[in-house]
Curated annotation (Swiss-Prot):
Organism name: Renibacterium salmoninarum (strain ATCC 33209 / DSM 20767 / JCM 11484 / NBRC 15589 / NCIMB 2235)
Gene it is expressed from: argF
Main enzyme class: transferase
Pathway recorded for this protein: Amino-acid biosynthesis; L-arginine biosynthesis; L-arginine from L-ornithine and carbamoyl phosphate: step 1/3
Residues reported in the UniProt entry to bind carbamoyl phosphate: 54-57, 81, 105, 132-135, 268-269, 296
HAMAP family: OTCase
GO biological process: arginine biosynthetic process via ornithine; citrulline biosynthetic process; L-arginine biosynthetic process
Family label: Belongs to the aspartate/ornithine carbamoyltransferase superfamily. OTCase family.
Keyword vocabulary terms for this entry: Amino-acid biosynthesis, Arginine biosynthesis, Cytoplasm, Transferase
Subcellular location: Cytoplasm
PROSITE patterns cross-referenced by the UniProt entry: CARBAMOYLTRANSFERASE
A GO molecular-function annotation: ornithine carbamoyltransferase activity
Cellular compartments per GO CC: cytoplasm
Protein name: Ornithine carbamoyltransferase
Length: 311
């Protein structure tokens, strides 16, 4: 059966551990696994489709596919018939006959679901409006490197709780058995359905979920502090108003002082210093942001290898 990765919970706890452990191995030995190379490996091309602009996602997938022995085929916005002159379902049926895997950075989660439903090759969510599961694999890999493990750690996210990063922190974090806290204004908290899914997964793993409007409560004693931009793509006209709303949720020195003394700081980038995160924090000694950015490469390589070898 073809395996896809559309949302963080598409990997169960054991599978998530397998992918992260493989990522650590690939970080030490980049060419350890090459599922797209060699005799009998099948197709070598991976379609990487971008409906949204990207730096880290584009570079990490392109480099990772090459290191896995494959060839990345980058398809930018407006460079195909996808979604306007040809249906998603028909596009999937064509691509599956030509490529080994489909990676898609897009807007609507439902589009990814339709692509996967009509594809016999793995489909990977490289970001949607609802989830950013590849980023969370990189984040968990980074935490595991610096903390030695994941289970039982407290991970706090401050800021816009209604965005894709908050959703993925909830789902990926509890899958790893972590205690996940989201601090956000009342009108910007995660959707109830996502919280419900996270609670269900937490019941399996011993993790927990706290959603609050109190950033001090959320930051207190945390092992990991994370944030994301307050102004996502398409929200540029709201920059001033959103900056005022989210100001109490900034990841600054005061927030960091409330966390555990050895807490690490995450930000998926791009970062806006002086807004969601202080320069002294992102550029300070507790920041692991640059390891986090690099780990997109290793985590996604592990994910692609894991999916292809099981599909």
């Amino acid at each position: 059966m073809t395996r896809h990765f559309l949302v963080d919970t598409d990997l169960n706890p054991q599978e998530q551990t397998e992918v992260l452990d493989l990522a650590l191995q690939l970080k030490r030995n980049p060419y350890l696994r090459q599922p797209f190379a060699g005799v009998g490996a099948g197709r070598k091309t991976v379609a990487v489709i971008f409906d949204k602009t990207s730096t880290r996602t584009r570079v990490s997938f392109a480099a990772g596919i090459s290191e896995l022995g494959g060839t990345p085929l980058i398809i930018g916005a407006g460079e195909s018939q996808l979604g306007h002159k040809e249906s998603i379902a028909d596009t999937a049926k064509v691509l599956e006959r030509m490529v080994a895997t489909i990676v898609w950075r897009t807007f609507a989660q439902v589009g990814l679901e339709e692509m996967a439903a009509n594809s016999k090759v793995p489909v990977i969510n490289a970001l949607s409006d609802d989830y950013h599961p590849c980023q969370l694999l990189a984040d968990l890999l980074t935490i595991k490197e610096h903390k030695g493990g994941l289970k039982g750690l407290t991970m706090t996210y401050l800021g816009d709780g209604a965005n894709n990063m908050a959703n993925s922190y909830l789902l990926a974090g509890v899958t790893a058995g972590m205690h996940v806290r989201i601090a956000a204004p009342a009108e910007y908290q995660p959707d109830e359905s996502v919280v419900r899914d996270a609670l269900n997964r937490a019941d399996e793993t011993g993790g927990s979920v706290l959603v609050t409007t109190d950033p001090r409560l959320a930051a207190s004693g945390a092992d990991v502090l994370a944030t994301d931009t307050w102004v996502s793509m398409g929200q540029e006209d709201e920059k001033a108003s959103r900056a005022e709303i989210f100001k109490p949720y900034a990841l600054d020195a005061a927030a960091l002082a409330l966390a555990a003394a050895d807490a690490v700081v995450l930000h998926c980038l791009p970062a806006y210093r002086g807004y969601e995160i202080a320069a002294e924090v992102i550029d300070g000694p507790q920041s692991v942001v640059w390891d986090e950015a690099e780990n997109r490469l290793h985590a996604q390589k592990a994910l692609m290898a894991w999916l292809v070898e099981r599909s």
